[in-house]
């Protein structure tokens, strides 16, 4: 009787292999679940970081697009304003020309006020002392050039003008090339042989021509004289 109790007790205390497997399986399942959970967490963190990065980039691109749109709007506005100003200016200019033509009528003058006409040219005699280069610039400001003598008749006409006082000297547009010694007008053409300076100054400096009492003479270009400007007459009024 006592031996049976001991045997029964031993049978009760020794665990079976099936029970042992049941106890070990939960620990194995728990380890695999942890690995899966960790991988899922890493993937989620990666997706979250990617989403944040893409969100930042999208915000930056959106800001650049908005900035470019604002610049385009400003440029369009400036262009519209410029176009409107040009139209307004053109309209005002055309209206002014129309009013001028209506008021002038038959009073069309081929030369500006106080200029003297001869054929297709207008002349103005400046009675102030200037060097040749300075007088050339003064004529350019008037839309003209220094007087170019194309014929004896033209020189006689200029000499007959009452403003050309006897004895005064007036620069004209002829000068001597320092290398070749040839004479040229401002436009690059050469004077006629009978219109070359009669009295020629010999000097190391540049030599230019001036008119005195119907005679063309040469002198140093840095000397001071009066001068005569010439421009084309208005073709519609000739």
Curated annotation (Swiss-Prot):
Question: Briefly, what is this protein's role?
Answer: Functions as an endocytic receptor on a small subset of myeloid cells specialized for the uptake and processing of material from dead cells. Recognizes filamentous form of actin in association with particular actin-binding domains of cytoskeletal proteins, including spectrin, exposed when cell membranes are damaged, and mediate the cross-presentation of dead-cell associated antigens in a Syk-dependent manner.
> Subunit comment for this entry?
Isoform 1: Monomer. Isoform 4: Homodimer.
Substitution effect: residue 7 to F = Abolishes the recruitment and activation of the tyrosine kinase Syk
Per UniProt, what is the name of the gene that codes for the protein in this document?
Clec9a
Residues on the membrane's Cytoplasmic side span 1-35
What is the consequence of disrupting this locus?
Answer: Deficient mice shown no alteration of dendritic cell phenotype and numbers and the response of dendritic cells to innate stimuli is not altered. No alterations are found in leukocyte numbers or frequencies in spleen, lymph node or thymus, and mice appear normal and do not develop any obvious symptoms of autoimmune disease.
Q: Where is this motif: ITAM-like?
A: 5-10
Q: Which residues lie on this side of the membrane: Extracellular?
A: 57-238
- The protein in question is named C-type lectin domain family 9 member A
Q: How does it sit in the membrane?
A: Single-pass type II membrane protein
The terms describing its cellular component in GO are: cell surface; membrane
Stored SMART domains: CLECT
* Localisation: Membrane
One BP term from GO:
receptor-mediated endocytosis
The C-type lectin domain covers 118-230
For this chain, the annotated S-S bridges are 111-122, 139-229, 208-221
Q: Which UniProt keywords are listed?
A: Disulfide bond, Glycoprotein, Lectin, Membrane, Receptor, Signal-anchor, Transmembrane, Transmembrane helix
Q: Spell out where the chain is glycosylated.
A: 81, 133
SUPFAM superfamilies cross-referenced by the UniProt entry: C-type lectin-like
List all membrane-crossing ranges: 36-56
Tissues expressing this chain: Isoform 4 expressed at high levels by CD8(+) dendritic cells (DCs), and at low levels by plasmacytoid DCs but not by other hematopoietic cells.
Q: Name one GO molecular function term.
A: carbohydrate binding
